[in-house]
Structure formats: C-alpha cells, structure tokens
Amino acid sequence: MAKKVVKMVKLQIPAGKANPAPPVGPALGQAQVNIPSFCSQFNETTKDQMGFIIPVIISVYEDRTFTFVTKTPPASDLLKKAAKIDAGSANAKQTKVATISKSQLQEIANLKLRDLNAYSVEQACKIIAGTARNMGILIED
C-alpha cells in the first residue's frame, strides 16, 4: 500500500546550495522533515546545475520520509543567462535591455519543454518568447 502524502512543499533553491537556513529550514521544519538529509540529497542531485535556481517539489509522507522532484530552472533565469544580463527591463514595452537569437530561444524551449504546458518545440518557443518580451529582451531572426 502506498504511503499517504501529508504535505507538499514547493521551494526555489540555488542549485547545490541548499542549507538549513531560511527558506529551506523553516519550510521543512514545519513539515517535520529531516532537513540535513534533504539538503545533502538536493545538493548532490543539483551539483551539475550550479548557478541556476532550481524549483523543487517535496512530498512529505506520514512517517516523515520525503521524496522530491526537481524542475528545470525558471525561463527568466535561462533568458537572463543567454542575454548576459542581471535583470529584465523595468519598462519592457519601451526599453529593450538585450537581444537573443532564435537558436538561443529554441535551446531554452527544448530545455523547458518537459515543464511547460506545450506538446511541441514551436509552442514552447512561443511561451518562452512571451516571457522574453515581458522582460524587455528582443528576439532576432
């Protein structure tokens, strides 16, 4: 018989840098999870993605055990890295802060495809292009 899930915790943690300090400690402490165990497992799983923020969904069971699923980094982080900028535009409609190529957009869409609500790379490209537009990033052909 399957274990009963008592709590789902969603966090965004820098890859390879989970520690018991906030926000990880308080969120998992409330769920009565072994925090050092989670931190070591998360850091081991995400050590190859250093420099990105990784969304994670933690399922906590009745017996205080847990499992977690990592997602792909947020599209905005991937776009900022591709455009080599620190932040998006404060006024995206009038001020463009950077440009990226269609090939860079497709790379990001391929990476994000499994987490997006899209069945094809073309649909994923449109979703990522919308995020880029809202950040003030121009896409050139």
UniProtKB/Swiss-Prot annotation:
Gene Ontology annotations of biological process type: translation
Pfam family, one: Ribosomal_L11_N
CDD domains the UniProt entry points to: Ribosomal_L11
GO molecular function: large ribosomal subunit rRNA binding; structural constituent of ribosome
Subunit structure of this chain's protein: Part of the ribosomal stalk of the 50S ribosomal subunit. Interacts with L10 and the large rRNA to form the base of the stalk. L10 forms an elongated spine to which L12 dimers bind in a sequential fashion forming a multimeric L10(L12)X complex.
NCBIfam families: L11_bact
HAMAP family cross-referenced by the UniProt entry: Ribosomal_uL11
Similarity comment text for this entry: Belongs to the universal ribosomal protein uL11 family.
Protein name stated in the entry: Large ribosomal subunit protein uL11
Source species: Phytoplasma australiense
Lineage of source species: Bacteria, Bacillati, Mycoplasmatota, Mollicutes, Acholeplasmatales
